[in-house]
Amino acid sequence: MAELELVPVKTRILTEKDNIVDAIEEYTQGQIGPDDLLCVAESVVAITQRRFTRPEELKPSWQARLMRRFVPGEGSMASLYGMQAAMELEGEWKMLVCFIIGFIAKLFGKDGVWYRLCRQASLTDDVTGTMPPFDKCIVYGPADPMGVAEKIKKRLGCYGACVADVNDLKRSAVLGYSRGIKPQEVAAILIDNPFGNASQK
């Protein structure tokens, strides 16, 4: 197996005023070659796409108040405003119906059905308290991560690119990737979260 080297690229804090491809090109000048795979955090991609909101801009529905009570742990969907934020994109009734379907599927031993039917339920990041000025924001999943990855690869001339959702709980998922990339292999490489979950730039 070829030796791998993970090289974090330091940037300033990116905002909705930035273009993600332009920013990556700016901060990787002279660092990326034809054999390199470039990975970018999904939350940063989403922020540059203006896909975020603040809790005070949301009005929680009764569906959100009910459903969050059945979500275990401290994930985004256990938060009232995290749940409502996902509903803003998926639809309140769709989320509720899919939640019921997922609950029934779970009784028969099939987990994760709700998250597969309502993708924003798994992609929405609740308020984290980190990375100002977005420390008080709820960040949605990115739009067209496959397209973003292809644009990055084309602009930089690298081996490949991907948009990944990684955290410090040993969970890693590749949401978008350029042609020729095997997402499961990349997810395994990123499992130790080189992006970081605090205020890393």
Model-identified regions with their sequence ranges:
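N-terminal and secondary-structure boundary signal
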Residues: 1-201
